[in-house]
């Protein structure tokens, strides 16, 4: 999985409108992620997997791509050593760890390490 594009997220102010747009344009279908308190729709049948996520009014967004890594802590450390920035890792319960990053040119991306043993918050 090292370096493979594994996930993308498209921010939207209106998830119904965005689902209609991408569904019609690209033939995508969507399913509710089931994550409590978040308007987050997973693409079905796309490679890599993706999602449409609602952003709050006044926020702007840009698509975020996720690259797979074998060791998220080593990868975030390397991002910093190479002159980029990296957040501390955060959990994706039952799936793995992610970290938001920026490269030396200010481009945002995320890293993801699969680990299905990551517990839900409070567990």
Regions found by a protein language model. Name each.
Residues 2, 26, 49, 67, ...:
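Short glycine-rich loop/turn motifs that provide flexible caps or phosphate-binding loops at active sites
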Residues 28-62, 108-115:
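Conserved short beta-strand elements that form part of the metal-binding/catalytic scaffold
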Residues 5-13, 31, 55-123:
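Vicinal oxygen chelate
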Residues 7-8, 21-22, 40, 66-67, ...:
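Aromatic side chains
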């Amino acid at each position: 999985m090292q370096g493979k594009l594994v996930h993308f997220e498209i921010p939207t102010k209106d998830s119904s409108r965005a689902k209609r747009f991408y569904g019609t344009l690209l033939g995508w279908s969507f399913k509710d992620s089931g994550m409590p308190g978040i308007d987050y729709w997973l693409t079905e049948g796309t490679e890599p997997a993706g999602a449409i996520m609602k952003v709050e009014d006044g926020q702007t967004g840009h698509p975020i791509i996720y690259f797979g890594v074998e060791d998220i802590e080593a990868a975030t450390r390397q991002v910093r050593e190479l002159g980029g920035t990296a957040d501390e890792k955060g959990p994706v319960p039952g799936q793995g760890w992610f970290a938001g990053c920026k490269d030396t040119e200010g481009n945002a991306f995320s890293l993801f390490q699969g680990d299905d043993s990551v517990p839900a918050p409070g567990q």
